[in-house]
Amino acid sequence: MSVNVYDVAYDLEKALRHSEEYSTLKNLYDEVNADESSKRMFENFRDIQVNLQQKQMTGQEITQEEVEQAQKTVALVQQHDKISQLMEAEQRVSVLIGELNKVIMKPLEELYGNPEEN
């Protein structure tokens, strides 16, 4: 019996969309975006985060000034209740996706072995 992995992947996508973790994330995201000041603060945080990640991935140096700005921004958003909750919800969804990825990669790990165990 042949399984269409794409159909299963779309079923997994639907399951993720209906999960408690995603539902919580979406609700918090909508709440943050409903308030203009919260939305601007969160967008600023995300812009800084993405910029630093891109620099890191391309091997560009991150300046001390950028590190300090990022630290100040993180401290600021952590004080904002809804944004802090949103970041926690993002982390929970990220953990869930990581766990799903482990399940998906299991056949290849069994075939080739797990490089983390060597």
Swiss-Prot record:
Any one Pfam family match given in the protein's UniProt record, by short name: Com_YlbF
Coiled-coil boundaries: none
InterPro entries: Com_YlbF, YheA/YmcA-like_dom_sf
Domain of life: Bacteria
SUPFAM superfamilies noted in UniProt: YheA/YmcA-like
Family that this chain belongs to: Belongs to the UPF0342 family.
Protein name (database record): UPF0342 protein BPUM_0928
Annotated organism of origin: Bacillus pumilus (strain SAFR-032)
